[in-house]
Amino acid sequence: MTNFTLSPKGQKLVEMYTDMVDKGYKKVDGTYEANVYNDFELKKIRGSIKERFKIHKIKTVLDYGCGGSDWSSSGFNEDQSAFDFFELDRVYRYEPARSIDERTMVDAVICFDVLEHIFVSDVANVIRDIFSCAEKLVVLNGACYPANATLPNGENAHVTIRNPEWWKGVVDTISVEFPNVSVTLICSPTYNKMLAYPTYSDHARQS
């Protein structure tokens, strides 16, 4: 783990996300949603992630910005839990909006539906913190479109909307500080479309 402090804007965002967890949020269309950030977004591409985990022999995972994802409940893949589907030994979670902090060194860190919720001034430090917890692999997903949710202050919940090339540039820049950690970056130009860049590490790139 790195020792960093979010910017004042970033800290305020965490407070707002905590408020949304407790009270729900207003959608862009004006309707109200009480079930906040409980979707297990990793489920959409579980097959390709499982293949990646097998290649890197992943047994321990940190779910960075886990929301309400439940790794032990059945139904992730038919009657299997995510824990069983990925054949893991241990899962740790980090979710500041729910006061969960189990950050530690693991084989792989996954981060889905998080990066676009981070204030742009904090993005580099957060990605660096993610890499610092990984021994083998980092899997990142960033949304590149406006959210259906609004923050309590009326802003769109996706506070940092950038194109895939922007995210790739940021991740490339930080990944060189962790040459032995492979990274899979998956960007979502729209909710139902994903763009996956080839998995790489700086060490492999220089071989």
What are these regions (language model features)?
Residues 1-108, 124-127, 133, 144, ...:
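Conserved N-terminal segment of class I S-adenosyl-L-methionine
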Residues 108-121:
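A short SAM/SAH-binding and catalytic strip from SAM-dependent methyltransferases
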Residues 132-139:
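Conserved acidic-Pro-Pro-aromatic motif
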Residues 140-146:
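Short strand-turn motif at the edge of the Rossmann-like AdoMet-binding core
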